[in-house]
Amino acid sequence: MRPNRFSLRRSPTAVAAVALAAVLAAGAPAAQAAGAAAPTAAAAAAPDIPLANVKAHLTQLSTIAANNGGNRAHGRPGYKASVDYVKAKLDAAGYTTTLQQFTSGGATGYNLIADWPGGDPNKVLMAGAHLDSVSSGAGINDNGSGSAAVLETALAVSRAGYQPDKHLRFAWWGAEELGLIGSKYYVNNLPSADRSKLAGYLNFDMIGSPNPGYFVYDDDPVIEKTFKDYFAGLNVPTEIETEGDGRSDHAPFKNVGVPVGGLFTGAGYTKSAAQAQKWGGTAGQAFDRCYHSSCDSLSNINDTALDRNSDAAAHAIWTLSSGTGEPPTGEGVFSNTTDVAIPDAGAAVTSSVAVTGRTGNAPAALQVGVDIKHTYRGDLVVDLLAPDGTAYRLKNSSSGDSADNVIATYTVNASSEVANGSWKLRVQDIARQDTGYIDSWKLTF
């Protein structure tokens, strides 16, 4: 997040260095009013975003900074190396990527734009984060955290073969720390007709603060509710974000009437006693004592906050893009949406899906989508049972995993199994005190 508005700012001279046609024609969105109606299409459940994957991206960004003068700031080699890393991941995942160049302070900057094929080009949902750091450090929380979460969510879209109703576009902004230069350049150079196609922009800036709060932007009621509902499902209270008002990359979008929202875990403001009581952490201490400092390193991340916010980002993107989650013609989805209660420390329960109309055996990459609501997911053992009773372990219990819910997609090599028949999801709670239920699950052939 850039410093507050009273800090010294340079006046940018943004100059295009690449043709904008590829960026502007890559499917910009149809503007909805800030109070747009909630999506009516049945949204597919978002997958769990693996914390280990997000942290692996942070490790790469840390290494890039270490190899390039200790930072990833605008105009420095570390920033371009960061862009190259993210772009390579997206290119390999099937995205159409575009580098948008601009000039600020006599140095070349870059925005990275990534479009996922498909979706309505007149309704574009964007999600983004600034990729640059300040010059004093690696910027792992500010804003490696947001950049890594958005990247891993984009990769999850690819892994799931997700087909949203809206067109999805992801962005990593340059020179945010100099005054939102990259995002302003993008918005200012987007024709009004293309701006009108933007259904919304989601911003993720500093989402792993070491003494975290859980703050939600209140700029658009639909987006705000989407995030609040997600955290309510985790029994995590939220507050409206005020510290970063106008200080991150959602501001240029908001200024031209695009619905915006986002998440934040706090920067230099001090955590109050009331906030420490509901969120944990240390009262009287900044949410991020290393904000804009050299100590904003890998050790400056709260894993729980990063994990929750990464999953919340995916949830919002899946929900607001209103996708059905159904695969291309020729594939098949078989699901069960009937709730099944899971007894506390009791016998295993099952939920059945009848697969019909298939020929031959199941695929070697059978996708098993699971949505289990539970207050301590480490208690759960989850198996897929083939029609002949063969069990495929999807998830083991883990006493140290205290997070809520199992929302994930697993891949099973079921090529030895006949496709048609009754498949079952089996779930057992092996420890006491926590409860839950199977919300829904599906097989994708």
Swiss-Prot record:
The entry marks the following residues as binding Zn(2+) 1, namely: H130, D142, D205
Question: What EC numbers are recorded for this enzyme?
Answer: 3.4.11.24
- For whether the record's keyword set contains Hydrolase, the answer is yes
Q: Which residues form the signal peptide?
A: 1-45
**What are the thermal characteristics recorded for this entry?**
Stable after heating at 69 degrees Celsius for 5 hours.
The record lists Ca(2+) as bound by D48, I49, D307, D311
User: What is the protein name for this chain?
Assistant: Aminopeptidase S
